[in-house]
Amino acid sequence: MPISCTGLLRLLHLFLLLSSTLAAEDPIISRFQQYLQINTAHPSPNYHQAVDFILSQAKSLSLQSQTIEFAPNKPLILLKWTGKNPTLPSILLNSHTDVVPVEPHKWSHPPFAAAIDSANGNIYARGSQDMKCVGLQYLEAVRNLKRFNFEPLRTIYISFVPDEEIGGHDGAEKFANSEVFDEMNVGIVLDEGLASPDESYRLFYAERCPMWLVIKAAGAPGHGAKLYDNTAMENLLKSIESVRRFRASQFDLVKAGLKAEGEVISVNMVFLKAGTPSPTGYVMNLQPSEAQAGFDIRIPPIADQASLERRIAEEWAPASRNMTFELGQFKQKMSVYDENGRPILTAHDGSNPWWALLEGAIDKSNRRFGRPEIFPASTDARYFRLKGVPAIGFSPMANTPILLHDHNEFLNKEEYLKGIEVYESIIKAFASFAAETEKDEATKDEL
Ligand SMILES: [Zn+2]
């Protein structure tokens, strides 16, 4: 017998009710569901509801809290657990509260219901991977540590920032450049990473820097029937071919397994603009005098940005071929180097004790981790690294398909719970770390 639409809806409702009842048995999971159910998707994230929820959690954990608006209606929450030696550089656990938009009809479960599939324990929701999981895992780890009367030596800050998904300019960027941040004397930041389809966690020490390139070609206009040199279209096509060859050379390195995705320069054409519009389409018997193309480029800090810029000026948009170019990202050019000319990355060798502490803590929780990687896209961690503060990208999600920004984003219940255990181990290791780091030495010099 066919089931009617209302019948289906009723069944769905019953299913949701059942899954939330099941979850209610586990307060940890039910808190995660509550956070996921707050719709903080762009373009109109409900930040205030998220703030209320986080603040109520902070209160239950007796953490000090403050809400700061670096931009109107874009609240950032800063929680504090004061250490026994607050003069030591502190630990910052960062996460963003916003999520990317959804196309609900393409989801198997409603994206803000946080329904649990009872067959396998998967929790479906936008933000389940990116990155409400991490934000609440920090808090759950703190809850457990407090229950066992753990007392941190170093002060622990937990920040919940807005707007990461739209560039972080009114969130982490303003925060990292604020007096509030300076006063926190942060020694290490933990921020987001990516899920890993295999059993090893992924750790990120840097990220690629976005560079948006627009190249423009000019040439004499002419009749569509005429063959002549140096048309705008021909000039642009030569450049596109050159860019395409470069892209293939980089992609081949990844395909051959010689480099990871984050270690090569990616170049992707994102628009192509040319032609003379007519009421019915385009004028067909006219060769246009202008043509342009746009490219999204991502450069790892281990690449030679200056040589890429030379390649752009000499090969991709040479003045000799009547070409010009604009380089930018959010109207300003980004660089893989900081103001002192050093590549923006966090050391992942013996010179950075935090890295060894992190690996040791993961080891202790009986989990594996892979080779340190460069994050292929951008996260808020870059703003902290730019300030010279080490930042490690890590989201404890192994055996999980990468579904950030995708339909049917989910995280398994057991994987979420395991992640809390791992953060307990990390926070314990970081907050108990008594030895002096380079930053500690510098702080002492100032005193
Ligand atoms: Zn994210």
Question: PLM ranges: what are they?
Answer:
Residues P2, L22-S128, G135, L139, ...:
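Acidic/His- and Gly-rich active-site-bordering loop/insert found
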Residues A23-P27, S65, N85, L194-E199, ...:
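Metal-dependent amide/peptide-bond hydrolase catalytic core
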Residues I123-L136, E165, N230-M233, F410-L417:
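Short, conserved micro-motifs enriched in small and acidic residues
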Residues N122, Q129-A206:
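Acidic/histidine-rich catalytic neighborhood of metal-dependent amide-processing enzymes
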Residues Q33, L55, L136-L139, R143, ...:
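Predominant activation on well-ordered alpha-helical scaffold segments within soluble catalytic domains
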Residues N94-H96, F160, V189-G193, K216-A218, ...:
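Short beta-strand segments
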Residues C5-A23:
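Cleavable N-terminal signal peptides of Sec/SRP-targeted secreted and luminal proteins
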Residues A41-P43, P72, N85-P86, T97-P101, ...:
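Solvent-exposed loop/turn segments at secondary-structure junctions
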